[in-house]
């Protein structure tokens, strides 16, 4: 029996805890949080809890939270406030907070939110059944936020209904300590999963009908597996040693992106998708230095050129922070120029939000909110205009689309191209899980429309 199965079977199953009660989990933040929520549901189902979509029907409510920016932190406190009225009507209702806010704000949550029964950190998801059992036994104000310092990272993928495409964690935490980022403090130091655990997960998922996996981590490129295996080696192993049809990965750090990885992607282009999410965060070298990103503007562009040379059809997306402390109008123009020079298909942009524990939160040259918001709107305007022009080149082309599901709003089939474009077309549900050729008839930045051929 392998370690993965042993780890899962070590979870004590006690149906008397759940007793068929409803559990509702509210999820904010990144794909890592979405994966964590799946794990929570799977663990609680083992205790005879039943997932519900309406919190009013739940006996257990968990908020799986994000603290990368200030707004989702405020949403947690607001959401707890809405549930306290439900708890007054039903004293048996249990409320827990996990995720990055649970890790970061545990003391303040316990101090200011008396309706919360328990708080757990990002490394303590597997302690959830025990916390819940104690809570339903009458214990209150429980906290478990200890970081697990064992290495490597031994948690298997738990997905209840994986569908056609799903995610597989390969790393956890981050050692980069960008001055704006709270992740090292909420997710801990970087750990990598053993290679064979990852491969076993993917093989199990393929048996359940999964066609595409995305290898997931805060910085997948810094993966350090057993026997000196790096991320490029891992990617090659997934391509050669599993039957999964499509492979993606996210997120990459520009400082760690190398020629070896490009070569592996080119060698296995039949499986590894031609899409890379490569955050540049700011277009100014001065700002990048203050962010502790460990690359310059020129070095980022050199990596883009290296990737495009080896993968001519590659599509890029990126993350951008606008209004970082000390950012001048000239610095911001460098960011706008970077967007148009690279021609990103998609951008995920936010105004800078000071986070606890981070170095940048202590910088004295913070920008006013109105300046940050104005620059963010300008960035969106520039990218939108560029994106509308760029996508026209796809009209009339044929794309290989992995059909994932039915678009609920329009009744059409939808899936993803190799370049991660969302494509809608007329078809039937029996196409789900198949890769079909679709001719693009109309292209918009957010979605393409086409006809199956």
Swiss-Prot record:
Q: Which domain of life is it from?
A: Bacteria
Give the cofactor note. Answer: Binds 2 [4Fe-4S] clusters. One cluster is coordinated with 3 cysteines and an exchangeable S-adenosyl-L-methionine.
Task: Write down the required cofactor(s).
Answer: [4Fe-4S] cluster
Instruction: Give the Gene Ontology MF terms in alphabetical order.
Output: 4 iron, 4 sulfur cluster binding; metal ion binding; N6-isopentenyladenosine methylthiotransferase activity
Per UniProt, the keywords (alphabetical) are: 4Fe-4S, Cytoplasm, Iron, Iron-sulfur, Metal-binding, S-adenosyl-L-methionine, Transferase, tRNA processing
Query: SMART domains under this entry?
Result: Elp3
Broadest EC class?
A: transferase
Q: Which residues cross the membrane?
A: none
Annotated [4Fe-4S] cluster 2 binding sites: 174, 178, 181
Its recorded reaction(s) are: N(6)-dimethylallyladenosine(37) in tRNA + (sulfur carrier)-SH + AH2 + 2 S-adenosyl-L-methionine = 2-methylsulfanyl-N(6)-dimethylallyladenosine(37) in tRNA + (sulfur carrier)-H + 5'-deoxyadenosine + L-methionine + A + S-adenosyl-L-homocysteine + 2 H(+)
Entries under NCBIfam families matching the protein:
miaB-methiolase (TIGR01574), MiaB/RimO family radical SAM methylthiotransferase (TIGR00089)
> What family, per the record?
Belongs to the methylthiotransferase family. MiaB subfamily.
The protein's job, in short, is: Catalyzes the methylthiolation of N6-(dimethylallyl)adenosine (i(6)A), leading to the formation of 2-methylthio-N6-(dimethylallyl)adenosine (ms(2)i(6)A) at position 37 in tRNAs that read codons beginning with uridine.
Q: What protein name applies here?
A: tRNA-2-methylthio-N(6)-dimethylallyladenosine synthase
Question: Taxonomic lineage per UniProt?
Answer: Bacteria, Pseudomonadati, Bdellovibrionota, Bdellovibrionia, Bdellovibrionales
